[in-house]
From Swiss-Prot:
This is Acyl-CoA (8-3)-desaturase. It is a multi-pass membrane protein. Residues 154-161, 290-308 are lumenal. Highly abundant in adrenal gland and mammary tissue and moderately in liver, kidney, lung, spleen, thymus, brain, and eye. InterPro entries: Cyt_B5-like_heme/steroid-bd, Cyt_B5-like_heme/steroid_sf, FA_desaturase_dom, Fatty_acid_desaturase. Acts as a front-end fatty acyl-coenzyme A (CoA) desaturase that introduces a cis double bond at carbon 5 located between a preexisting double bond and the carboxyl end of the fatty acyl chain. Involved in biosynthesis of highly unsaturated fatty acids (HUFA) from the essential polyunsaturated fatty acids (PUFA) linoleic acid (LA) (18:2n-6) and alpha-linolenic acid (ALA) (18:3n-3) precursors. Specifically, desaturates dihomo-gamma-linoleoate (DGLA) (20:3n-6) and eicosatetraenoate (ETA) (20:4n-3) to generate arachidonate (AA) (20:4n-6) and eicosapentaenoate (EPA) (20:5n-3), respectively. A motif (Histidine box-2) lies at residues 219-223. Belongs to the fatty acid desaturase type 1 family. Pathway: Lipid metabolism; polyunsaturated fatty acid biosynthesis. Residues 1-132, 181-268, 330-447 are cytoplasmic.
Length: 447
């Protein structure tokens, strides 16, 4: 039986905890399938069965590491680890037995140890510290574009040309605000979580009309287990709409499952992917999310966006014109968002969680796009997706500085570090969908 979790950190209980030793077999059995959830951080074993529901980063992201070593994701996601460890004391139930390795045999020890040395080097170099002027100017350029969009209609009227220009400017505002909220959501701007969360609410809530809690819930899972089926929500379109990855597509075919004609998915992707995700799904689901979970602060920030848009554009366009502008902007933004966010992951390895080490988890699911001033701006520096996934709290203006160090690490251990031109990255989304669709069809018909 599992030992009862210790609730109050006093000296006597601390001594008892030091005497409790566990094996990896015992830890692996507490993966959540039987309700109990344990995880390991720096050889210490924590019972997160009840705490997972109260976890500030979301219940699912921490549960995805139940039964596993979570040392590297713990370090990667938290900016004030000392404070977090104090709250973790009440969850501590023991540690790994002395004869047990520090992590599971599925993980590369030499690679993990060297990556941790790289992490320490990166911190000593100051690459985890943000240049606040960079983010201030980035915010100002978004606000200026927002004002320019309104001035275009106010000065030049609402005929086709100024209306179209306004829509393009507003789409740019929404896309760039999406990249900026991503920075604050990852706690990569300020040294305290409080300030990051506050500005995150402003950017994603007031500038975009979306809830911060929804983004945290979805995006942190993606970073914890990228391209892992049933753990990464970014691939939840498998198998309902798409057959993704070689492994999962063949599995689906062998099981004789056909929710869609997957062998044509590289064609209908252009209809239900880039143009539809935001206006036909996210736009409505986010309201369901905040109401269902009673996220009233998020709802207030979201409503402030709609109130602002209504009172600034309604006098110029009327209700029909405003609705037309709004959905054109969401349509354009959706295309921008989907192509950029999918180019780094969909063409890469997609599978079930194999519980490999942190570096392998991120590199097998992630690729980069070549650096240029335009690519950096257009993608919000997500063209450095590998560096971002390895160091999610690193300010984006430092990605190019750490990239050579990451490349050296990958070369030493024979890990493919893939970077490609922007248009090639876009095309690879379609090619990978075509390939996995064909693999599904072959397995469906012949296996």
């Amino acid at each position: 039986m599992a030992p009862d979790p210790v609730q109050t950190p006093d000296p006597a209980s601390a001594q008892l905890r030091q005497m409790r030793y566990f094996t990896w077999e015992e830890v692996a059995q507490r993966s959540g399938r039987e309700k109990e959830r344990w995880l390991v951080i720096d050889r210490k074993v924590y019972n997160i069965s009840d705490f997972s529901r109260r976890h500030p980063g979301g219940s699912r992201v921490i549960s995805h590491y139940a039964g596993q070593d979570a040392t590297d994701p713990f370090v990667a996601f938290h900016i004030n680890k000392g404070l977090v460890r104090k709250y973790m004391n009440s969850l501590l139930i023991g540690e790994l037995a002395p004869e047990q390795p520090s992590f599971e045999p599925t993980k590369n020890k030499a690679l993990t140890d060297e990556f941790r040395e790289l992490r320490a080097t990166v911190e000593r170099m100051g690459l985890m510290k943000a240049n606040h002027l960079f983010f201030l100017f980035y915010l100002l350029h978004i606000l200026l574009l927002d004002v320019a969009a309104w001035l275009t209609l106010w000065i030049f009227g609402t005929s086709l040309v100024p209306f179209t220009l306004c829509a393009v400017l507003l789409s740019t505002v929404q896309a760039q605000a999406g990249w900026l909220q991503h920075d604050f959501g990852h706690l990569s701007v300020f040294s305290t979580s409080t300030w990051n969360h506050l500005v995150h609410h402003f950017v994603i809530g007031h500038l975009k009309g979306a809830p911060a809690s929804w983004w945290n819930h979805m995006h942190f899972q993606h970073h914890a287990k990228p391209n892992c089926f049933r753990k990464d929500p970014d691939i939840n379109m498998h198998p309902l709409f798409f057959a993704l990855g070689k492994v999962l597509s063949v599995e689906l075919g062998k099981e004789k499952k056909k929710h869609m004609p997957y062998n044509h998915q590289h064609k209908y992707f252009f209809l239900i992917g880039p143009p539809a995700l935001l206006p036909l799904y996210f736009q409505w689901y986010i309201f369901y999310f905040v109401v269902q979970r009673k996220k009233w602060v998020d709802l207030a920030w979201m409503l402030s966006f709609y109130v602002r848009v209504f009172f600034t554009y309604m006098p110029l366009l009327g209700l029909k014109g405003l609705l037309c502008l709004f959905f054109i902007v969401r349509f354009l933004e959706s295309n921008w968002f989907v192509w950029v966010t999918q180019m780094n992951h969909i063409p890469m390895h997609i599978d079930h969680d194999r519980n490999v080490d942190w570096v392998s988890t991120q590199l097998q699911a992630t690729c980069n796009v070549h650096q240029s001033a335009f690519n950096n701006w257009f993608s919000g520096h997500l063209n450095f997706q590998i560096e971002h996934h390895l160091f999610p709290t690193m300010p984006r203006h430092n990605y190019h500085k750490v990239a050579p160090l990451v490349q050296s690490l990958c070369a030493k251990y024979g890990i493919k570090y893939e970077s490609k031109p922007l248009l090639t990255a876009f095309a690879d989304i379609v090619y990978s969908l075509k390939e996995s669709g064909q693999l599904w069809l072959d397995a469906y018909l012949h296996q």
